[in-house]
Amino acid sequence: MSGNRGVVYLGPGKVEVQNIPYPKMQDPQGRQIDHGVILRVVSTNICGSDQHMVRGRTTAPEGLVLGHEITGEVVEIGRGVETMKIGDLVSVPFNVACGHCRTCKEQHTGVCLTVNPARAGGAYGYVDMGGWVGGQAEYVLVPYADFNLLKLPNREAAMEKIRDLTCLSDILPTGYHGAVTAGVGPGSTVYIAGAGPVGLAAAASARLLGAAVVIVGDVNPTRLAHAKKQGFEIADLSKDTPLHEQIAALLGEPEVDCAVDAVGFEARGHGHSGSQQEAPATVLNSLMGITRVAGKIGIPGLYVTEDPGAVDAAAKHGALSIRFGLGWAKSHSFHTGQTPVMKYNRQLMQAIMWDRIKIADIVGVEVITLDDAPKGYGEFDAGVPKKFVIDPHNLFRAA
């Protein structure tokens, strides 16, 4: 048995690297399992969803070990595991899923029915998602390993592209899911709300799917400049020029075929004054306004049932002032919920290995040490155009 260290949430605005228990072959209720593996973590990423917790915008308990974006090397195998072996390099979908229940069999692994006693769906290191220990650590347990893990073939080639492959655990499939559920295809005009890592992953996915034009909107000028550098059109939502007018200036018409919400419940308003304050319904309402009749809206951005820091009493319980009548009148289709990573990760792995997508450059991957994780959280919260990837064992240098 080895020691272990991980990134621990200690209350709003505070995370710390601490000694934590080495993983055991047990579920969160303490029951012995034979279907799991223990990984030496090769990479684990800081996600915008983690930031929601760290900002105190969820009911996450102090002491929670963070991290749901994990790539690792198998170092221990449960007695019931059949397809994994010691030394395998694997990508871990952020969804914890059993593979046996109805929703798993229907590829809805984001809402597995058995891994979380409180509700459908499980994830590592996340509030209300089953108590599975997070992977921003040196070692982590992965249950139902035969079902959940994506083996990365050819370890040497994979390590050469590890900065890209680390995005397979969440943000690339999540962005892709947003684009797919928004109906993106060859020739589509697409608007992406949010120039953070998920928004850029959605934009890159739209391009991969054949979109003619991809517009990324945000209130953060630094992130918009990065998006522009990656070849996307941009809409500056901190300006008083309405979004539909900015789109019309680019396309010659004020609406798009497809739209993606990559922001979620901590959205800000639009315009010089509006962008200075939260307005959680802004993105959804704006997307209904600029999506054409019979268009589709993909919503991978996170919305919660409880938000202690919400701007009003209704939003504290996930109730937002949505112009649903507009969406109904325009016959919009909406798709929400946790991304079923397994539905896409194998194909996206192939796209990375064959240089069809350079996701690390697009989302601004910056590799940091485990000890630098608190600093990474601080910089990410300040809005830098980066995706922080933690390298707990300094393996990237050897790659």
Swiss-Prot record:
Q: Which parts of the chain span the membrane according to its record? A: none
Q: Which residues bind Zn(2+) 1?
A: 47, 68, 170
Q: Which UniProt keywords apply?
A: Metal-binding, NAD, Oxidoreductase, Zinc
EC number(s) from the headed UniProt entry = 1.2.1.46
Q: Which residues form the signal peptide?
A: none
User: So what does this thing catalyse?
Assistant: formaldehyde + NAD(+) + H2O = formate + NADH + 2 H(+); acetaldehyde + NAD(+) + H2O = acetate + NADH + 2 H(+)
Give the protein's biological function: Dehydrogenase that catalyzes the NAD(+)-dependent oxidation of formaldehyde and acetaldehyde.
The protein in question is named Glutathione-independent formaldehyde dehydrogenase
